[in-house]
Every structure is written in structure tokens, then in C-alpha cells.
Amino acid sequence: MRYSSLGLIALILLCAPVAGQGKRLTKKDFPDISWQAAGKNGAVCAGGAEAVVAGRDALVKGGNAIDAAVATIFALSITDSERFCFGGEVPILVYDAKRDVVETICGLGTAPKLATREYFEKRKGSIPAKGVESAAVPAMVDGCLSALDRYGTITFADAVQPTLRILDRHEKKWHADLAVTIRRMIDAEKQSPSDRKRGLRLVADFFYRGPIARELDAWCSANGGLLRYTDLATHVTRIEEPTSADYRGYVVYKCGFWNQGPYLLQTLRLLEGFDLKKMGHNRPDTVHAMTEAMKLALADRDVYYADPLFVDVPGGALLSKQYADLRRPLIDMKKSSHARQPGDPRGMKAILDKPPVEGKGGDDSQDTTTCVVADKWGNVVAATPSGFNGVVAGKTGITLGTRLQSLNIWKGHPNCIEPGKRPRITLTPGLVFKDGKPVLAISVAGGDLQDQTALQVMLNVLDFGMSPAEAVTAPRFATKHHLGSFRQTPPELGSLVLYPEFAKATFEDLAARGHKISVPAKKGHLAEPSVIVIDRKTGELRAAGDPRAKRHAAAY
């Protein structure tokens, strides 16, 4: 097996557990990892540096993009544990080059059978943002196992070795317990040493229908949780067709309507009516048009998007060019909208007669991380792992997420909580194709700001010709003119947040149009993008993650 010099550095670092025992590693321990990288054999861009190394090493050892993504995701549950947990979720978009198909792995858990609207309405008045009651069925593990089974080449044991090396440093109290749990899962896989796929199924059975499921049931039952063994035992990871829309000769893929991703596609439909390149990057007209288009698409998201297995989502109409043509005239280029204006896709009307439901308070959340991977065979993965604010389930070491807070308790609303229902989540990876081949993969952390940032980074590349590094570091903007996706925070009508790097004249122009201007409050950045751009002519894979948001990249 041949290794690049960079790969050997990483392997030497990671194969010395004694030197790292008990030591919290920092970026200085990975001198070859930066926020941007380029190569022709493989590329990874994600959150924690050590997780990026895990993915890069999987590629160097001969694994494909799916193998590398899964290794990265498992490691992120430790390196980025304040944003993503082992009991969390991860929607994944995969381009399988051999089969020439894009598929969605819905790594999203459902509401437990005990999680009813009546329960939360009577006992809580809302779905809590924190604690064990808000835990959905843990879905990340089966999502990753399904990815390895369908597209991968490595075993579960191979995928989690970097994760175990991190856990064995015992930086946090629960690390030792989770390491034991993972090694028990490996022992289950070893019962099928010669059949990789059967071994993966044995791991899934051990977690969802075996000892771990029973331990999670016992702990949740004793500690006020709603999750039970039957919820885990009946969990299924769905493999679905993605949603998509064409845009100026490109095709953009997103997850289904259980996800906020399709609103980015709606926004693109609206923006096709504007010559953004001629209008100029981040010029007042461009920022205004993009913001107003997002407001319209977000209004539809808040009214119609939900689990299609439970409600009839008018997806085809929402993404149609006819509907976009009806809605586009609502954009007044001289004036910021201060009203939420959902449309009527079923009746093909520009504005819905019934006013939208307003929020009732709560807190915003940005507990998410990122992962994009591409390999030399043409496979590409975009994944958005998330899940935190939960609690560690006893000696399992597994932190449960709080994804139920993305549902509501409004009777009759499409996203109202029901047992077995998937929350309408913000986690929204994306792929972009040109002439039938992938040219861009993107993942963004940042709650409701994810697709606002994804839109800008994508258009920075597609319309304005930027490099990945330029695209993720260019000044950004965002609006909170929408219902919050976490505990339904009220909209901030007319709001527009601008990076301070925007020209003074741009601030003044947009304020004159009625936008309520502010600057970012959180460490100077809006959301946290990671992107890979694939040069179809040279085969170069160029990765970049926003350095302000501590994203990391590696390639070889």
C-alpha cells in the first residue's frame, strides 16, 4: 500500500495512543491540516481536525468517499461533541459513481410512541429544548451502517478505529463508557468475520434490537425519557430519491420535504428571473433580491414542509417553475417585505388566503457540524451530522439528542408531533451537478441559517466564479424573517444581518429599502460551511471550510 507523505504524518500521529493518553489534541497536533486543501485522489472537509484526519486516512488506505465519510462522521461525534452526538442524526446525500445515481440516506429518527401532542401540551406546554424527553430514536448509527452496507468497502471496526483512539484518551467522563459500548458492537460484528455485510447487520441488531436497545430502554424508563425498546427495534433507515431543481444549466440536489433543503431549490427557481452576475456580487440589488426570495421560500417551508409519510406535501407544485413565476412578482426591488407571505401551491395562487401560524417563544439552536468527501473514482458524499443538548444515557456513554424540538404541538399543523413521525429538520446537505456529473458538494452547520449560507456559497461558485476558499470566506448575510425551527421562535420580520465587511453604502442602501439591519453577534460569522468543488477538466478536488468557524480540510 502506498501512502502520501501527508498521510504518513497523520498515521504516525494517530498510531501513538500512549503519547496522546489523556491529552486533548489541538490543531497544532495536525500541522498538515488547514481550512483548505486540494488533490486528485481524495478530499475531506468537516469540523474537527482529528475527524478530518480520520476521513483522509480512510481514503489513503484505499477506501472510497463513503468509507471516509462514515469514519469522519463517527469521529465527529467525539471531536464535535458539543454539536453532534453518537445518539444523534445525519442526513446523507451520496453520488454513487458506479451506478451513476444520487440517493438520500435519511439518517433521521422518529418520535417515540409515547411522544404525543397531548403529553407535551399537558405536561410541558411545549417540547423542551433540553433533556431526555426530547430524544428522538437515535439514527446516526444505522444511517452510517446503511451507508457502509450500500456503498462502502470497510467494516464497522475499521470505520470506528479513529473514534476509539480519541475516546481512549478519556478527555471526558463518558468517553470510557462509550468506548466500551463501541467495542461491544465490534464484538458483535466479529461473529461474521468473512461476510462484511452480515457483520454490519449484526452491529445494527446489537444496537437497535439487542443489549444496547434494552439498556437505553431501561435508562430512559428510569429517568423520565420516552424512548423505549420497541422504538429502537422498529427503526428503519430509509433510502430515498432526493429532491432536485435545475438552475442555469446546473442540477441541485437536496433531501426531501422532511428537511428544509427544498426551500433552497424554491429560492433558486425565484432567482432564475434575476441576472445576478450582471447585478454584481454582494451589491445592494443582489442582496435585496436574494433576501426577498429566501423570505418567500421560507414562508412556504413553515407552512407546508413535514414528514411526507404522514402528510400530503405539495412538493411537485412547490418546486415547479409555474409556481415560481407566480411568486416572483411579490419581490419588490425597492422595498423590504415585513410580512410572511406563504403561497398556495395547490391552488396555484401567489399568496395563501389563510395567514400563517406565528411562533410562541423559545431559543434558537446551531448544534450541528459538517462533512463533505470526494474520491478519485467519482463518488461524492455530503452529510450534515447533528444532535446535542441531550443527556448521556448512563453507562452506555451514548448521548441522546433533542430532535423532537423540531416538531411542534399545534394541532392540525403538518409538522405537529405524532408517534413515529420524523421532525422537519434543518440539516441540509447539498450536491450540484453539471452535464450529469458532480461539481460541488456542500454541508453547512447553523440551524435556520444553513441553506441561507449554502445558497450564497453555491452562487459564489456557480454565478460569480469564485474558488472554494473565496466562496466560504466572502461576506455573508442572513434573515430571521421566518419561524424558528427549534421550539418555533417568532419571526423577526424585515430583519437582515450583514457582515461588517459590507460597504457602508450597502448598509445605507438596504436600510433605505426598509431592511432592519444588524451585524452578527456570534463570533463574527453566520453559519459554518464546508465545500468541495470538483474541476471536471483537471480532476482536481478543491476543499475549503470557513476558517472563522473552525472548519478543516485535507486532500491528497
Question: Where on the chain are the PLM-derived regions?
Answer:
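Active-site rim segments in enzyme catalytic domains, especially the processed small/beta chain
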Residues: 78-95, 99-103, 225-228, 369, ...
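Extended C-terminal regions of large enzymes
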Residues: 254-257, 262, 432-449
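Short loop/turn motifs at secondary-structure junctions and domain boundaries
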Residues: 235-236, 361-366, 422-423
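Noncatalytic scaffold domains of N-terminal-nucleophile
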Residues: 21-53, 57, 65-259, 319, ...
